[in-house]
Amino acid sequence: MAASSMSSLTSSYHTTAMPSSNSVVPPFDARNLEIKTKSIEQTLIPLVTQITTLVNYKESYMASGKPKSERAMRAALKIGSAVEAAIERFVCVGETIADENADIQPEMYDACTEARLAGASMANLSCACNDDPNSVVDKAVLVRASRQLLSSVTRVLLLADRVLVKQVLRAEDKIAFSLSRLESTRSFNDFVKVFAVFGGEMVELAHRSGDRQHDLKSEKRKAQMSIARTSLERLTMLLLTASKTYLRHPDCDSALQCRDGVFYQMKLSLELIAICVCDGILTTEKSRYIQDEPDMPIDIALQLTANAAIKQLTEMLEMIRMTVRVGAGVRERIVSALDALCQLTQDFTDSAYTPHHQREQILDFLEECRFEMTNLIQPDENEQLAASGLEVTVERLNRRLKDLSKQLQIVAMEQISEVLRANEDQVLLSSMKACAVSGDIDGVEKYMHKFREHADHMQEVCRLLHHISITDALHVHTGHVERNMRALAPLTILAGRTLCVHPSSRIARENLEVFCDTWGQAVNDLSRVAKESDVAANGRVAAEKQAYMSLPRPGKHGTTQKPSKPITLDVEDQQKMAKVGLEMKLLTSEVDAEAEKWDEYAENDIVKRAKAMSSMAYNMYLFTRGDGPLKTTHDLFTQAEFFAEQANQMYRTVREFSYEVPGSAEKSDLSAILERIPLHCQQLQVMVKSPTVGKTATFGKVDSVIQETKNLMNEIAKLVTASFVCATKYEIEFRGGSVNGRTGADGERTSRESTVWRRTPSIRRAAPPTSSHLSANNSSSIHI
């Protein structure tokens, strides 16, 4: 019923009184009732359903002219009274929110009064239809009352939503204040105290902003919120080490500049969260979080890209096709749009890394577009010929734009593939670190210069990827990958210079290591969005991480007949698991990287199982952050059980593979790792099935399960690496298919369905792949 649905859903807006704050939210516009969150939309669905039933009842009666049955009349009357009762409870919640938030009190009282009157009006109209079936109640009156009711209820919900927005902004204000205190602190003891408070405030903001992110309807805003939250999480670690380095070496200019740069990036992330929760409308002063105006707009979704320019041109051409005319205003706009596209493609043609033949192809496509544009905008004296030729010209220009878009995509993806395949980051950063520790200033300067050039190349590649992004989410993600690299590169160099000045400083070394790790995360982000962009551009559905929904349902087809009551861990427990969860995430990245090496040969069972296990471990890592598809401890345990089953299957697959490996040191290493897998699987399965009572015991079980999963994942990473070494050294390749169960002379092969592995002659391995093979696997060369 509408009553129960609305009362339960609106209860989420109930909030306790909060202290006054200077947070300012956008002013409420009663004429703009656009719904931007899923919760408001879901709250309105039951009410819309009931109102639709009432209107349809009246319409069907007027169409047939026959009195309805008593059952139908009672149902309609019951709906009217239920809607009125639900609105009354709904209004009571709204008035409670108004009492606790003085800034929205007048508007909320007014909206509640309006909703109460509209609910009573709907109930009266429903009674009128049932008391006297022959009475004439105009449908327009009923529709008008329905609109008034929906409008007033939506207004109450939007006002309540302002309270949630204000809570996020207040949490940001607390962090901004703590950042200013951290920035002015000169004592290490004071810094530790303030940072402890700052950490608690970050947890509060993470939960409030996370709830808001999941509630947003706009994919663009959700992507921006996700990026801002991830940036804050990474920057917090950088802030800790950079501040400790500066406090240890207060006279070091590079340490001060590095710390100040991290502070500035954190304030930019806070500003981006504020933009997301306020939907781009900020009434706060510009200096609220950042003093200086940034070089680029914070809302990166406003930036124009080559793909966006092509899309604008395509929409204009479609309008011309429909109207069959090109007016003076349209002519000016379409020429301006083509000029903008030509300017944006200069990032491709001016790049030193773009091959000459690809540069010429892009310029040729642009020249063809200009030629077709000239034919389109030139007036023709013969109107009949103009009308017949216009559609042909529009079709030709559309085809040229598609060809240009495809060529830009090829150029961008090839450059990204090359830079990721080279993998220069680790070599440069480790060399710079080694020179800094040894006090080799010349060596540090040398590798700093190389890293600076490499970082510029990475940013240029990111810019090309940004140009070819075709969805709102990818547009945001690719733009912020470039921005993060542009901000992180000079800070990493400053951290290296600090270590060079103080080579014996442990905290300076730790600071550089953290910056290097963060740069590696940025490179992983680039790899991920590059693959997603390639998938989206080719019209394929992006492969999601293997989610919990793929697991067997407990009780019906699963392994646990009586699942324990799901328990959701609180913030403190999640914080305790964050460290081991992060370690497991790093292992998933390592397994993914090792699995990607096999793409040169074939997509075999080892690769598939490694990627599947990496996906499941990643979901368990997200659980330690309070995110992802695993919502309760029961979900986690079921996922861990399935993870152990996958590990057992991996064991059988690699064992079959090991039969083709000749006796050697490599086979001994592989066998030694392989023997440890069943033990870890058994331990994990025992932990999952062990009963627990109480929250403390459950947390202990969760901690043990995640720790054992991490240990098993570590062995899987070693196993994949050892298998790859054997496959490449002894030229063993996967042929596909399955074989019937059989037992060899040694009695080892007993699997019913096994991977077919065969030794490959060296001459075949050395043969270069054909061009068709290269083109078919162009997208698979992007490493994650």
From Swiss-Prot:
Residues 737-784 are annotated as: Disordered. This is Alpha-catulin. Pfam families: Vinculin (PF01044). Interacts with slo-1 (via C-terminus); the interaction is required for localization of slo-1 to dense bodies in body wall muscle cells. Interacts (via N-terminus) with dystrophin complex member dyb-1 (via C-terminus); the interaction is required for localization of the dystrophin complex and ctn-1 near dense bodies in muscle cells. It is found in: Cytoplasm. InterPro entries: Alpha-catenin/vinculin-like_sf, Alpha_catenin, CTNNAL1, Vinculin/catenin. GO terms for cellular component: plasma membrane; striated muscle dense body. The vinculin/alpha-catenin homology 1 (VH1) region plays a critical role in interacting with dyb-1 and mediates the localization of ctn-1 near dense bodies. The vinculin/alpha-catenin homology 2 (VH2) region may play a role in the precise localization of ctn-1 near dense bodies. Signal peptide: none annotated. It comes from the Eukaryota. It comes from Caenorhabditis elegans. Residues 745-756 have a biased composition (Basic and acidic residues). Its main location: cytoplasm.
